[in-house]
A protein has these predicted regions:
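Aromatic/glycine/proline-enriched transmembrane-helix motif characteristic
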Residues: 1-145
Length: 145
């Protein structure tokens, strides 16, 4: 199979067709944070689609944008030069969302970022080792009494 090329184009939101087998989910709090990021930064990441408008990546962005702007709103999308097979689609989904692009440096997060802001911006307490963030001598809320 030849290398797939991706081109930037514009599409109406109503024309984009979500993948019924998309394994990614978003809860209300995450959707609200995503909407807040659109308000502050605009649509930084595009939605990736196939030649016939099937969504490969960006289902959560699509849902939030539809709720915010409606189906007639146009967005920039990345269009594959050819359709992906189901196996390629599964593989792409995992690659894009499960660490293929790197991991967090928790030392940098702990020393250079504010915990409250990280939690506001989308980290969950379970994602962070909260004990690392406690000043010396201060007990964690989760510590036994």
């Amino acid at each position: 199979m030849a290398k797939i090329n991706w081109n930037n184009e514009r599409r109406k939101l109503k024309d984009l067709q979500p993948w019924s087998r998309n394994p990614r989910q978003i809860n209300k709090a995450q959707a609200a944070r995503l909407a807040e990021s659109f308000n502050e930064f605009g649509q930084v990441e595009t939605i990736a689609i196939g030649p016939t408008n099937e969504v490969y990546n960006g289902h959560q962005r699509l849902g939030v944008l539809l709720a915010k702007y409606g189906g007639e709103h146009e967005v920039e999308v990345r269009v594959a030069s050819e359709p992906l097979t189901e196996k390629q689609r599964e593989k792409l989904t995992v690659y894009l969302h499960k660490g293929a692009a790197g991991e967090w440096d928790f030392d940098v997060l702990a020393n250079e970022f504010e915990l409250d802001e990280l939690l506001d911006w989308g980290f969950e307490k379970r994602d962070l080792d909260i004990d690392l963030w406690q000043p010396e001598g201060e007990a964690s809320d989760d510590a036994p009494v």
